[in-house]
UniProtKB/Swiss-Prot annotation:
InterPro entries to which the protein is assigned, alphabetical: Integral_membrane_TerC, Integral_membrane_YjbE
PANTHER family found in the cross-reference section: MEMBRANE BOUND PREDICTED REDOX MODULATOR, SLL1022 PROTEIN
Coiled-coil residue windows: none
Translocase keyword on record: no
Chief subcellular location: membrane
Name of the protein: Uncharacterized membrane protein YjbE
Bilayer disposition of the protein: Multi-pass membrane protein
Keywords: Cell membrane, Membrane, Transmembrane, Transmembrane helix
Source organism superkingdom: Bacteria
Pfam family membership, one: TerC
TM ranges: 9-29, 42-62, 67-87, 107-127, 134-154, 159-179, 192-212
Organism, as annotated: Bacillus subtilis (strain 168)
Protein's cellular compartments: Cell membrane
Family: Belongs to the TerC family.
Length: 218
């Protein structure tokens, strides 16, 4: 029994760590323009709100999958988020600090909400009804998310072009969510090329659209 518990725990921790890497990218990108103190607040608050929300999502995992086009809507949101983070201006003096902070937290939480959909289903299955496994797995992933986002922020400061890689990751994840939506499964099964190419095309679309916007704004 203990052996099965440990195996399930390792599986859940692995799932949470994989998602934690994606979360760290989103957190670093969403908070990169904030002053140091507010960035720390955004990282900590955003992480803990997202983790608490994911615990609730895991409890409702089965019901979530029955909502029509939820994954598709989440995928489209991630495309928008990837685009928005690319065109975001660093000069935010006209925005109140508190507004910027809560906007960053909102971005982190919403991105986590949609990016977690697939993972909470996997976690719910791996936990076999042991809710303690869900909580332990998420607690283990928290330091990874927090420290990972700080390291990614440092990398973004040194190599600004990495923002395109981060947005590309969001776009690709969004494209994958769209093609995996249950309501679109029949169409995707009949058009295998679309299923393969769509995530790649969404990356190209988001990056090219942001470059076009920046050229127009000059």
């Amino acid at each position: 029994m203990e052996h099965d518990y440990l195996i399930s725990l390792l599986v859940i921790v692995g799932i949470d760590l994989i998602l934690g890497g994606d979360n760290a990218v989103v957190i670093a990108m969403a908070s990169r323009h904030l002053p140091d103190k507010q960035r720390q607040q955004a990282i900590i608050l955003g992480t803990f709100i997202a983790v608490a929300m994911r615990i609730g999502l895991t409890s409702a995992a089965v019901y979530l999958l029955n909502i029509p086009f939820l994954q598709c809507a989440g995928g489209i949101f991630l495309l928008y988020l990837g685009y928005q983070l690319l065109i975001e201006k660093k000069d935010t003096k006209h925005i109140k600090s508190s507004t910027s902070l809560w906007r960053a937290i909102r971005t982190i939480v919403l991105a986590d909400l949609f990016m977690s959909l697939d993972n909470v289903i996997a976690v719910a299955g791996a936990s076999h009804g042991e809710f303690s496994l869900v909580v332990i797995g998420l607690c283990v992933s928290v330091p990874v998310i927090i420290w990972g986002s700080k390291l990614i922020h440092i990398a973004l400061e040194k190599i600004p072009l990495l923002i395109y890689a981060g947005s590309g990751l969001l776009a690709y994840t969004g494209g994958e969510m769209i093609v995996r939506d249950k309501k679109l499964s029949l169409f995707m099964a009949q058009h295998g090329t679309v299923e393969t190419l769509l995530p790649i095309l969404t990356v190209a679309f988001v990056i090219l659209a942001s470059i076009y916007y920046q050229q127009v704004e000059k």
